Design a protein with these regions (language model features):
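Amphipathic, non-membrane alpha-helical segments in soluble helical-bundle scaffolds
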Residues: 3-6, 42, 76-83, 108, ...
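Charged, low-complexity surface segments at secondary-structure and domain boundaries
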Residues: 42, 68-69, 126-130
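An amphipathic alpha-helical interaction surface
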Residues: 82, 87, 92-165
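Membrane-proximal alpha-helical anchors
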Residues: 2-67
């Protein structure tokens, strides 16, 4: 065997090993992404099933949200905290959906209409707070998520799962 032949074989082997490493790396990244999405989905489901989240949902659906930042600040501390906590939960959920870390289908199937109803209650206060703080980014992902859920419910409402069987 000549040195040229050996060099060609070595170069081919090197190229093949680089291709194999690249394919392996791509597969690993896809697997890690899928695992992360699955983990976040399960975590979101667990969060929706906590007593704390149930209390937040119950409060928000049963009470009016103050229309202004000032009226929100005058609420008893525990009520203001509940209103803030629920908005933070919805904001976090919106971020997870916007960044495609969890699928909007999960939100639609679990608390979809709640997001829209809650945003309807929060909207006036949040818009007031955005102007007065000023913080134009306040609850932007909560608003975005509620708008996406509304669009889905209007344009392509899903059928209840039990009707599919």
């Amino acid at each position: 065997m000549t040195s040229e032949t050996i060099t060609v074989i070595a170069n081919i082997a090197l190229a093949v090993s680089a291709i194999i490493a690249l394919v392996f790396g791509i597969v690993q990244v896809k697997t890690a992404t899928r695992d992360r999405r699955e983990r976040l989905t399960l975590e979101a489901l667990r969060n929706f099933n906590t007593r704390e989240f149930s209390e937040l949902m119950n409060y928000v659906t049963a009470h009016d949200i103050p229309p202004t930042h000032e009226k929100w600040q005058k609420l008893p501390a525990h009520e203001g905290i509940i209103i803030t906590q629920f908005a933070q939960e919805m904001e976090s959920l919106g971020i997870l959906v916007a960044e495609r870390l969890i699928n909007i289908d999960l939100v639609d199937k679990t608390i979809g209409s709640l997001v829209s109803i809650a945003w309807g209650k929060y909207k006036v206060m949040i818009q007031d707070s955005r102007k007065k703080r000023p913080d134009p980014f306040l609850c932007e992902y909560f608003e975005w998520l509620a708008e996406r859920i509304d669009e889905r419910m209007r344009n392509a409402p899903r059928k209840p799962f039990y009707l599919k069987w």
